[in-house]
Structures are given as structure tokens and as C-alpha cells.
Swiss-Prot record:
Descriptive protein name: ORM1-like protein 3
Key words, A-Z: Endoplasmic reticulum, Hydroxylation, Membrane, Transmembrane, Transmembrane helix, Ubl conjugation
One of the GO biological process terms: regulation of ceramide biosynthetic process
Family: Belongs to the ORM family.
Principal location class: endoplasmic reticulum
Entry text on domains: Ceramides bind to ORMDL3 N-terminus and stabilize it in a conformation that physically restricts the accessibility of the substrates to their binding sites in the serine palmitoyltransferase (SPT) complex, hence inhibiting SPT catalytic activity. In the absence of ceramides, the N-terminus is flexible and permits substrate binding, thus liberating SPT from inhibition.
Naturally occurring in which organism (per UniProt): Ailuropoda melanoleuca
């Protein structure tokens, strides 16, 4: 019996990225972050693009690949307790529309950032390292893998 819950999913984390309008909201949030950073005086456009990319990728890494469990009281008897949000998404099925969207978004942002920074070497290295830090954990081969035991518990 689910006392105090109003959802029909066993774990709402599995379907949250399939909610209506979530993709548009996500893209608008990235755009809003960029506009807010652009409004800071004396900061150049290349630095703003790099900051947008770094903040986005840091947030994505933290929320999708380090935070584990679910904020809800779920009747799954703790099965989601040791899984990151990325591993819970779409019940662990690989290559769904939501997973593809969340994989392509940092790549598109990386291309935009590289273009607007005019492929400056320092910006390019920072943005490439940032992109790899969010793309590598998304690989299907790393589903449930904890490298060196980091984030195991």
C-alpha cells in the first residue's frame, strides 16, 4: 500500500524525463543560464560560452551520475537505492529517446561552445574534458560500474 503517494509508478525517477514538456524546459533552462551569464559585465562571450558548458556539464554529472537513490518512498524494497538517476532512467533500458536527448544535448552545447570560442586552445581543452566527463559515464558498458569503488555505496 502506497500511503501518501499520488503516482502510479513504482519509482517515478524512471519516467521523469519522458514527462510532457521536460525537454523544452531543459533547453530553456540552459538558454536562461547562458543569458544570465551574458548579463555579467566585463565577461567576454567566449568565457560565457565556456562557463555555460562547464556549469551545465557539472550539474549533469552531479545530478545524473553521482546522486543515487530516489527522493520518494518507493515500494521497490530499496532496489533503486544503489543506482544513479541515469541507471534508473527508463527502467535501465538503453538507447531510449530520453537517453539519446540527454547524450546529444552536451554534444550540441560543446559544438556551439567550440564555435563561439573560435577553437581557442584553453577553452577547447576545458570543454573537451568537461564533455568526456559526462559522456563516458553514459556508455552502456559502464551501467552499474563503479570505477575504483568510487560512489559504490
Amino acid at each position: 500500500m502506497n500511503v501518501g503517494t499520488a503516482h502510479s509508478e513504482v519509482n517515478p525517477n524512471t519516467r521523469v524525463m519522458n514527462s510532457r514538456g521536460i525537454w523544452l524546459s531543459y533547453v530553456l533552462a540552459i538558454g536562461l543560464l547562458h543569458v544570465v551569464l551574458l548579463s555579467i559585465p566585463f565577461v567576454s562571450v567566449p568565457v560565457v560560452w565556456t562557463l555555460t558548458n562547464l556549469i551545465h556539464n557539472t550539474g549533469m554529472y552531479i545530478f545524473l551520475h553521482t546522486v543515487k537513490g530516489t527522493p520518494f518512498e518507493t515500494p521497490d524494497q530499496g532496489k533503486a537505492r544503489l543506482l544513479t538517476h541515469w541507471e534508473q532512467m527508463d527502467y535501465g533500458v538503453q538507447f531510449t529517446a530520453s537517453r539519446k536527448f540527454l547524450t546529444i544535448t552536451p554534444i550540441v552545447l560543446y559544438f556551439l561552445t567550440s564555435f563561439y570560442t573560435k577553437y581557442d586552445q584553453i577553452h577547447f581543452v576545458l570543454n573537451t574534458v568537461s564533455l568526456m566527463s559526462v559522456l563516458i559515464p553514459k556508455l552502456p558498458q559502464l551501467h552499474g560500474v563503479r570505477i575504483f569503488g568510487i560512489n559504490k555505496y
